[in-house]
Amino acid sequence: MKNQEIIEVKSKMFLRIWAFVGSAGMGLACLWLFYMGITFQTKYYLLAIPAGFLFTLFCLYLFIIFFPAFTPRGNTIFRIKTGKNGEVFTDKVSVTFTDIKKIEMSRHKFSLKGIFQEDILIQTVDQKTIRIPTWNIIPNPLFFEAVERYILPHLNEEAKSNWIGQFTDIQRSAYLKEFENHPKL
């Protein structure tokens, strides 16, 4: 690995397709259910009308929050500049390794979107929280590998203990062994 190399952590096309099917596909199915109800083509029209309407709105909301994943912005989730003076950055935000206090990929309470999607949450030493959206199109092991290989060696001791404390010894040794045998980055 060269000093100051840029590593791109990219999304998985399979997960992008599932997000599209789950939001747009189910939205169309619910719209069809609503249509069946309002044209009285089913004897359950009293259930089909409100259920179709509500679930169509729900799926439309899901499609809207997943929409950036279907654009070129969803190709690369974040980039890592390696080395001692490295940083995690996207087109909008940048955090140096020395400023990271805690890094994790989890659901959050900062918005309604956090109920449905995991984001990369970086807490800095000056108590700011930086959120990098993932739209659930990056698998957790890929994120773990990026942190373990390129970020963790350059973090301060508190950040290292926060990262390692998220996992049991068995979990961590299992995924470290997997990264050695089958690297994805």
UniProtKB/Swiss-Prot annotation:
A lipid is attached at residue 30 (S-diacylglycerol cysteine). The keyword Cell cycle does not apply. Its main location: membrane. A lipid is attached at residue 30 (N-palmitoyl cysteine). It is a lipid-anchor. Keywords: Cell membrane, Lipoprotein, Membrane, Palmitate, Signal, Transmembrane, Transmembrane helix. Residues 1-29 form the signal peptide. It is found in: Cell membrane. The keyword Repeat does not apply. GO terms for cellular component: plasma membrane. The chain crosses the membrane at residues 45-67. To B.subtilis YfjE. This is Uncharacterized lipoprotein YfjD. The lineage of its organism: Bacteria, Bacillati, Bacillota, Bacilli, Bacillales.
